[in-house]
């Protein structure tokens, strides 16, 4: 009988991955979802990007791009100051401008690969830009490129939103990680449809509700780690997997 075992085809960009213990690998494609002022999305972002226990020190200032339509978010100002992000890398959401950033990073990555080097790690943070439909209306736009193809250029993308349903299907299905605060049953139904790999929906719903029961607590979903599901301290949750 013929041996029809599927053999792995090596993608050169696979070597650009940075495996990490207990947190999602880089490059990461993450969604952080929680209600405004009642969750702690900005606090999560500061912890992730400033502390060495997470991603602190893994991105050079000139390779960090902060996209936000909220000029008054003090925590984002702290983030920009602490990371020494250039002013030219801080901007409101604009499809054209973000496309220019993506094209620039992709060109630089291609030059590095041609020279036999790994692309530098880049980070794009898109903070609370979903209320105007920027993360959902253009399914063929730059956000889709970031979540579908950004890994080839070693681009990590983190998007925050108040509702999971505000994200496009492309973003939702291409996430490698998510941090989810408590939400409505309607939102949870959509999350369950996308992110439940357990034996039953009931088990996933129970895990979600238990993980998000306390104020500012959340569920971590990390597809790069065994078991997928983690609590607010990034510790694995016992499941049927």
Question: Model regions: which residues?
Answer:
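Short, surface-exposed linear segments at secondary-structure transitions and domain or protein termini
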Residues: 101, 240-241
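Generic preference for hydrophobic/aromatic residues in regular secondary structure cores
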Residues: 14, 31, 90, 218, ...
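Conserved P-loop NTPase motor cores
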Residues: 16-18, 27-62, 67-79, 88-206
């Amino acid at each position: 009988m013929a041996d029809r075992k599927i053999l792995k085809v090596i993608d050169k960009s696979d070597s650009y991955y940075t495996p990490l213990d207990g947190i999602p690998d880089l490059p990461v494609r993450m969604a952080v979802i929680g209600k405004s002022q009642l969750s702690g999305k900005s606090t999560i972002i500061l912890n992730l990007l400033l502390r060495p226990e997470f991603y602190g020190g893994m991105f050079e200032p000139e390779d960090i791009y902060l996209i936000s339509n909220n000029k008054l978010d003090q925590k984002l100002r702290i983030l920009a100051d602490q990371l020494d992000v250039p002013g030219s890398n801080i901007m409101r959401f604009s499809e054209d401008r973000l496309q220019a950033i993506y094209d620039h990073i992709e060109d630089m990555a291609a030059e590095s690969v041609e020279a036999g080097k790994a692309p530098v790690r880049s980070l794009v943070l898109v903070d609370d830009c979903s209320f105007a439909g920027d993360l959902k209306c253009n399914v063929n736009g730059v956000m889709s490129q970031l979540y579908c193809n950004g890994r080839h250029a070693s681009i990590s993308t983190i998007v925050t939103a108040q509702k999971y349903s505000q994200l496009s299907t492309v973003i939702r299905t291409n996430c490698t990680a998510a941090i989810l605060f408590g939400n409505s049953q309607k939102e949870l139904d959509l999350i369950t449809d996308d992110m439940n790999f357990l034996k039953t929906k009931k088990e996933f719903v129970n895990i979600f509700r238990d993980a998000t029961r306390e104020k500012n607590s959340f569920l971590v979903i990390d597809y790069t780690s065994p078991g997928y599901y983690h609590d607010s301290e990034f510790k694995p949750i016992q499941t049927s997997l």
